[in-house]
Amino acid sequence: LMINESLEKNKDLKLVLGEPFLFKITNNTPELGRDIVRDWDVWNGQLTERRQIVKELADKYNAVFVPYFEKFQEALKIAPPEHWSVDCIHATNAGHEIMARAWLECVTKAGFIEE
């Protein structure tokens, strides 16, 4: 794994792994996201598996885990999916702010940076 190679080359490496996320944009779905909405059960099933894999890797390698999926689930209570994502996968500026705040919260809590 790339993680093993990286850790071998740098024993002081601190890993931060971000949880994958996906949005189901049903209003005016952009062309890039239409296959995701059309095949939502497949995409969402794969996402669930990948979320678990990333969490397991974070646990195995003592990495900081950033729960992006969870943070976006909270954000969806405030605004619809198209506010957070442009095409079901890529974040908007508002989505990037959610991600940045989540990342900072997690790495600060882990002691990687000072408050």
Describe these PLM feature segments.
Residues 1-115:
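Alpha-helical cap/lid subdomain in secreted, periplasmic
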